[in-house]
């Protein structure tokens, strides 16, 4: 940490005798550690020296070159890629929309359920953004009624609520944090099984040298990029397509009825709100 700011590392290839030290990239000051290119014993030893350099300076996160083969050496020294979770939560609504597009789910027809074990700023922001164009949006979270009521008052959105013990029938269930995966198509937002590719402007040649997603996460963490200056380029679902079990026809119909009943409750609540305005 330097002056209250967490110093992030930057792993660079040594080509002409470069020395470890500070380096500014995309407006952010990094602690640069140089390592040899290629693979083999010499490259592995060089990676270990670079990792030790960052470790001694208490650097916990570093941006690595594209397809760098010795990231595990750094991990053993406690140096990992920048955490993606803060950016992923900030871009949750856009990630969900990308996943919907990949699955061919039209906002005006798809039933989307947002599931969480507790309320969070990320859940509320995603619900608020998605309620603008997703016609059938449901919340499955403790005190979800409060958020649904807020969205009805603020946005006029018809957001339904489901109890956490109800079976969820949705075209896509989006799970925040450690919410148990329901049946059907699931987007486990915080899982590493979901791959998200990001983009931003003015990276220049840096995007060709370093892992672009790691670099963007580092820029976001350093406040060099705002969330609205970053976009989601692609979302890749788990290999099995996010399918978590197959519902029988009876259970599927029961789940559909639960969703419809929740929708009717939301419509009734909306009418009640209108009468009291």
List each language-model region with its residue ranges.
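Structural motif
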Residues: 13-14, 37-38, 64-67, 115-118, ...
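Glycine-rich phosphate/diphosphate-binding loop of Rossmann-like nucleotide-binding domains
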Residues: 102-166
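Short loop/helix-cap segments at secondary-structure boundaries that form the rim of catalytic
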Residues: 20-22, 71-78, 147-153, 168, ...
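Adenosine-phosphate binding glycine-rich loop
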Residues: 21, 34, 188-277
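Glycine/serine-rich phosphate-binding loop and adjoining beta1-alpha1 elements at the start
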Residues: 28-107, 202-241
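Rossmann-like adenosine-cofactor binding region
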Residues: 157-209
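N-terminal basic/disordered segments at the start of proteins
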Residues: 1-27
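Flexible, charged surface loops at secondary-structure boundaries
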Residues: 1-2, 51-59, 75-76, 105-108, ...
């Amino acid at each position: 940490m330097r002056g209250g700011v967490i110093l992030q590392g930057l792993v660079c290839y040594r080509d002409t005798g470069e020395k470890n030290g500070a380096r500014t990239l995309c407006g952010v000051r990094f602690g640069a550690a140089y390592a040899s290119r290629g693979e083999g014993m010499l490259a592995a030893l060089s990676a270990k020296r670079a990792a030790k350099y960052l470790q001694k300076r208490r650097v916990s996160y570093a941006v690595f070159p594209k397809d760098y083969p010795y990231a595990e050496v750094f991990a053993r020294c406690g140096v990992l890629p920048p955490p993606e979770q803060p950016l992923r939560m900030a871009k949750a609504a856009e990630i969900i929309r990308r996943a919907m597009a990949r699955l061919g789910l039209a906002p005006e027809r798809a039933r989307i359920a947002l599931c969480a074990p507790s309320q969070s700023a990320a859940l509320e922001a995603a619900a608020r953004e998605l309620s603008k164009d997703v016609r059938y949006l449901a919340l499955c979270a403790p005190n979800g009624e409060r958020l649904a009521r807020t969205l009805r008052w603020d946005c006029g959105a018809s957001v339904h609520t489901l109890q956490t013990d109800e079976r969820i029938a949705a075209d896509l269930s989006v799970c925040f944090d450690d919410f148990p995966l329901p049946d059907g198509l699931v987007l486990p937002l915080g899982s590493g099984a979901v791959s998200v590719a990001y983009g931003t402007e003015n990276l220049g040649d840096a995007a060709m040298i370093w892992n672009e997603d790691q670099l963007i996460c580092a820029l976001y963490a350093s406040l060099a990029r705002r969330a609205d200056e970053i976009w989601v380029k692609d979302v890749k679902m788990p290999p099995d397509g996010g399918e978590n079990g197959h519902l029988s026809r009876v259970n599927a119909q029961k789940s559909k009825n639960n969703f419809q009943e929740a929708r009717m409750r939301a419509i009734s609540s909306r009418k009640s709100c209108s009468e009291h305005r």
